[in-house]
Amino acid sequence: ENIQNASPAPGISEAILNADGVILCPSNPFISIGPILAVPGIRKLLIQTGAPIFAITPIVNQRALKGPTAKMLEELGYPVSPIAIATLYRNFLDVFVRYSVSVVIEFNQEFAIR
């Protein structure tokens, strides 16, 4: 409510534009990341920055890591998948990180981890 009257906190614009990288943590895209992206100017800053922008999926094996993300995706008509999350950030995202069992197995074998 009244998000159109909000503005980035002091220093945020400069921080995004001068960042070496931006990471969107594996959080709910609607109730955690969404309100931040709804602040006027934030999406534009993410598009304008020269920094690579990474997002980490909060969906693994069609389930949320925590919270209501999977349920919300379903209720809003999205598939419960990492790809659905990536599409929400598509206009500014450079790298999308998702869980892959095969990568974990290769990593574990490579580094002799259980």
Task: Describe every region a protein language model picked out.
Residues V103-I113:
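N-terminal low-complexity segments that are often proline-rich with Ser/Thr-Pro
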Residues I85, R114:
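Short phosphate-binding loop-to-helix
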Residues E1-I83, N91-L93, R98-V101, I105:
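Conserved catalytic alpha/beta core of Sir2/sirtuin-type deacylases, generalized to analogous enzyme cores
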